[in-house]
Regions:
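Beta-strand-rich domains and repeat architectures in extracellular enzymes and scaffolds
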Residues: 2-11, 21-24, 42-75, 339-347
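Surface loop/turn motifs at the tips and blade-to-blade linkers of beta-strand repeat domains
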Residues: 44-49, 88-91, 103-108, 146-154, ...
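Blade/loop signatures of beta-propeller domains
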Residues: 9-43, 80, 318-327
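Short, conserved, GDST-rich strand-edge loop motifs in beta-rich repeat architectures
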Residues: 172-192, 278-315
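Asp-box/WD-like beta-propeller blade repeats and closely related beta-sheet repeat scaffolds
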Residues: 95-113, 118-119, 123, 127-188, ...
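Residue-level detector of Asp-centered blade-edge/turn motifs that repeat once per structural unit
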Residues: 59-62, 117-121, 163-167, 224-226, ...
Length: 371
């Protein structure tokens, strides 16, 4: 018999035992070195009838945050007195967009992921997983589509972006040219390397592909001096750096190897980077992600999303984020190791001594006081 078949069968048998007996201690991710388990003290702000505040952005006046949710809306936080209000939508077809979470309707309702404000104009730029790169004015409403295809190929999974206001360009990612957002686990487990990093020129409307062959291209962040742009590769647990200017211009290197699965990257005012972890990685998840044949075999089993996700996060919801220097050095690690308050972090935005924390799966955001 083919050795690979035997190995696959053995691997799947082991995973079946783990899932059957709920042996979380076998594959629970260990604490991160030097971490502070303080995120459970975060203040929780619930969303009314909404789920999945993936990204958070503040407008030029400091109001917000604004966040995109799973039913295609973009909400604005107006403080505890007024709560969340509708600000914008990415699709005009809203008739059936009535459930907080309905993955089967995302292609109709839209799914806004990365958000960034142009601090000069007040326009909000949106990476919608299904409708591409969009923009909406300071007064909100229906977003306008800017980019829906590149090189004749539709954008299937627009994910995140950053804006270079000096050059008037937007760097953005398409996580996959094979899978849609609602199939993100298939992209991660199948060793899909069809992700791209692109540049959109706001004046000429031209799109340039900067990087191809990325593994689930995710979060994007421009350096403070604009010399390089970072892009997170989720399955490989690393952040890649593309040099834009200077003696290294055009070169690509590894900025950081991570002990978790990265989502969005956000730069703070000092030029450091907060990287959100959907989850830390443990023995089982590292093994799965490091051996594509295991992931592909998992996808063939009738496990369903919840059980596979359970495996990947180590059997226990938790939250983690890491702060990196401009050179990729670890400066700070924060956790909610028991998932008491926060879970499945998708973005960390530092503002005025606080961390505003989003989650692509939860019905709330968190505010953590750094002081």
């Amino acid at each position: 018999m083919n050795p690979r078949i035997i190995l696959t069968a053995t691997a799947l048998a082991i995973l079946s035992v783990v899932l059957t007996f709920n042996t979380t201690h076998v594959f629970t991710p260990p604490p991160l070195p030097g971490s502070h388990d303080h995120l459970h003290t975060a203040e929780i702000i619930h969303l009314a009838g909404a789920v999945g505040p993936e990204s958070l952005a503040f407008d030029p006046s400091g109001e917000g945050p604004y966040t995109g949710v799973a039913d295609g809306r973009i909400l604005k936080w107006q403080g505890h007195a007024h709560g969340w209000v509708d600000f914008a939508v990415t699709s005009s077809n809203r008739k059936e967009c009535v459930r907080p979470f309905a993955p089967e309707m995302e292609h109709v309702c839209g799914r806004p992921l990365g958000l960034r404000f142009d601090q000069k104009t007040g326009d909000l730029y949106i990476a919608d997983a299904y409708f591409g790169l969009q923009v909406v004015g300071p007064n909100g409403g229906l977003a306008t589509q800017l980019v829906t295809e590149v090189e004749g190929q539709p954008l299937l999974f627009t994910n995140d972006m950053d804006i270079d206001e000096h050059e008037d360009v937007i760097y953005f990612t398409d996580s996959s040219t094979i899978f849609h957002r609602r199939q993100f686990m298939s992209s991660i487990l199948s060793s899909d390397k069809s992700g791209k990093l692109m540049k959109y020129n706001k004046s000429s409307k031209e799109v340039t592909v900067l990087l191809r062959g990325l593994s689930f291209a995710n979060g994007v962040a421009l350096s403070k001096d604009r010399s390089f742009v970072l892009v997170a590769e989720t399955p490989t647990r690393r952040i890649m750096r593309l040099w834009l200017h200077g003696p290294n211009a055009g070169n690509l290197d590894v900025f950081a190897e991570l002990p978790g699965v990265p989502d969005n990257i956000r730069r703070n005012s000092r030029g450091e980077f907060w990287v959100a972890f959907h989850c830390k990685t443990g023995p089982i998840s590292n093994w799965i992600l490091s051996n594509p044949w295991v992931g592909k075999a998992l996808l063939k089993l009738p496990l369903g999303f919840k059980k596979i996700h359970y495996l990947m996060v180590g059997g226990k919801p938790h939250a983690a984020a890491i702060r990196l220097s401009e050179k990729g050095e670890v400066l700070e690690v924060l956790e909610d190791s028991e998932g008491k308050s926060l879970r499945f972090v998708s973005e960390v935005e530092e503002r005025n001594g606080k961390l505003w924390i989003g989650s692509v799966m939860m019905p709330f955001i968190g505010i953590y006081n750094l002081n």
